[in-house]
Amino acid sequence: MKGQRQTMKPIKNFIAAVGLTLALSAITNNAHAQGSNMQEKVKNYFLQTLKTKQNEEQKSKDAFQRNKTYTTDIQQLIKNKDIAQNQKMVWAAWYEANRELNEQKLAKPEDLRKGVKSAWNLPEALEKNAVMPYYYGVKGSAVGKLPLFLYLHGSGPKEHEWATGLILGNRFQDGPSLYFIPQIPNEGDYYRWWQVAKQFAWEKLIRQALVEGNVDANRLYVFGISEGGYGSQRLASFYADYWAAAGPMAGGEPLKNAPVENCANIGFSFLTGADDTGFYRNILTYYTQIAFDSAQLARPLDANKHPLFVHRINLLPGMQHHIKYDLTTPWLKNFVRNPYPKTVLWEDYDMDGRHRSGFYNLQVLSSPTKNRTYYDMNIHNNVVTINIKEVEYTAVERDKHWGIEMRFNRSYTDAKGGRLRIYLNSELIDMNKPVTVIVNGKERYRKNVKANLQDMINSCTEYFDPYRVYPTSIEINY
């Protein structure tokens, strides 16, 4: 009997071990199944939201200009240790939803020297008969994630300007890199890179390029020449939270069209001929230089003690409208975006009647005004301080020939009646400690935040950016 008991003990231990292994396996398989089911649920939400947005864009210009925000009903708290895993799941669901969406896809990049042509049809409701041909190609080694340059051409005959863009893109010393070189869809009054149909194209480009996975999301650059200089200056300010750097050339916008504060945290190059007097390009470039220099003096460092306004703005001596174009992209390529600045300056303005709904980690749920709102956010030691102002412009200089408003004064008053969502992550705050939010000098929030799936989904929908799948947020009425 004693020998039998000794024999039975290892057998019982073996059976217990097998049982434990099977139980753990069942738990693991169940967790995996639950994860797969949740990813499918999130993907279906993303796909339905993308289809809804697509229908809105096709329906009317007014609907596109409203630029509504979307909020999911999917809710689930997440432990801090599981944040990265869930962010990965959400981005995978976003990838799958974009892949399944029925739309014209971004062409696969080939060698830029081949000049392979592709095209997108832009929504008829935004611009009639708008077909945007483009080159999308790679320079140098295609290994790993590459920087992406968006080049905007000038306002000559569009076929000629587009062909010149391909020549320049191949010539510039910035490889290895990817280039997206579009042709303006229509000439005349639609020969503007900042109009709503083109906004549709830029947001589609960024969304699809970041999903494809061969683009470095922190190394996106926009630049252009002449009309493309005007366009890239506007896009630099409007979409600054996506760019690592921007480089208009031979342009010059009145700064009401491209507020310099938005270009905090990015590199900004602006080169114009000193004798380029057409439409006051040299004067307006000089005014931009003064504005950047003044902004740098007023706010030299961000909350992390890094330079806030890194810029190179030069009037090139002895040059008119044609300048040295090769100087810009090598300078731009030195910059890498910080997707999580603790100092955010944002003048929320309309471009062709359309406002952005978010910028960096801010999302506007309800604007305090139909006009302009200025947000000044600083994060330090888990305290989020935001000053929100309404902005009024008064022209103080106009040209006598065309009536172009050249210079402005701005006045600010405290904004009231808005609702703002502030997305946060461990790069911006300590997720284990209470967070305080102060708006216009008044404390609006003081408590701990919790990571959750809803904020990850909402922020992914808003920004379509792999670096901005935020695990938590705070909503503030003011």
Model-identified regions with their sequence ranges:
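A domain-start/cap signature at the N-terminus of enzymes
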Residues: 34-146, 445-478
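Gly/Ser-rich "nucleophile elbow"/oxyanion-hole loop immediately N-terminal to the catalytic nucleophile
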Residues: 139-144, 190-226, 240
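Short substrate-entry loop that stabilizes the transition state in hydrolases
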Residues: 141-191
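Primarily recognizes the serine-hydrolase "nucleophile elbow" in alpha/beta-hydrolase
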Residues: 218-264
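Catalytic His-Asp charge-relay segment
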Residues: 265-273
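C-terminal catalytic histidine-bearing segment of alpha/beta-hydrolase fold enzymes
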Residues: 271, 277, 283-285, 297-395, ...
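Active-site-adjacent alpha-helix of alpha/beta-hydrolase-fold enzymes
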Residues: 272-310, 399-419, 425-433
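C-terminal beta-sandwich/jelly-roll accessory domains of carbohydrate-active enzymes
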Residues: 353-478
